Amino acid sequence: MKPAKAKPSGRFFPKSRYEDYVMQLTGIHHLTAISARPKENLSFYAGLLGMRLVKKTVNQDDVSAYHLFYADGEARPGTDLTFFDFPLPPERRGTNSISRTCLRVNGEQSLSFWRDRLKQAGVNVRDIVEVDGRLSLPFEDGEGQRLTLIDDGGAGSASPWAKSSVPAEFQIRGLGPIVLTVHDLARTEDVLTSVMNMRRAREYAAHGARMVVFAMGEGGPAAELHVIEDREQPAARQGAGGVHHVAFRTPDEAQYHAWTQRLNEARIRNSGEIDRFYFRSLYFREPNGILFEIATDGPGFATDEPMATLGEKLALPPFLEPRRAAIEAGLKPLG
């Protein structure tokens, strides 16, 4: 299905110029959150949630901190929920933040399985409810990370992990949608539609407020942002149990370079192109201050480890390998 074009405001690109662009982000690539308790984090996400630890590495900008990647059985882009190990106080919730992360499962039976499993583990879990036409199950991890399991209707392919503690038919299939809370919706919408080529898909009521859905690529829950405007709360303060950034998928390096050019032409401050070894990254902040990343689908996590043994040892990109002994000495054991 050919994706529909967004309607630009014209603030960043004139309409004639916009019509020349066919670039499309294809969905959520990964989401990176913050944990101050990495051992507990590993037990919750790899143990209770049954996700696969596909990469145990370090924050490339602060090698004293772990960077843990949880994903599906084949470590595919769009399934990665990742955590920085930062010893921070708890997040102060508020606006201008990524306020909820949704994880996709297949069917109401899966949600019932998860409700019972989470309750038995003493997790703060609510009842199954319908939101935006999809059944969902909101819950929080031990640090207050806000999560929701949603029924994606089995859309798209799935890659269960054979060694998971969760039966294959109930395993988490991937990310999305991602919920943002912003002070000024119009400014965020301008960037999402006129720069990032998303389209305003629909609206629905949630928690007594209006939620606006922005879709990318072919759409669907793996390719949506749900944005709520909140002009009452103060801005969130980043901390443990909060989210650091969300990344969006671009299929190859040619489009990745084109996105860099596009941000520069729109005069949006950005990080410039960064090689993260497992993928290429480009960071920038939308107008309300939330950190976005555009990331390539490849090369992937099997670049430096066999697929069969992903996550079993500390992996370091080549430029950090000479410092392995010092880095390992500075990390606390996870197991």
Give a label for each model feature.
Residues P3, P8, S16:
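Cationic, low-complexity basic patches in intrinsically disordered or flexible, solvent-exposed regions
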Residues R11-V22, G27-A36, V54-T57, P87-H183, R202-H226, ...:
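Vicinal oxygen chelate
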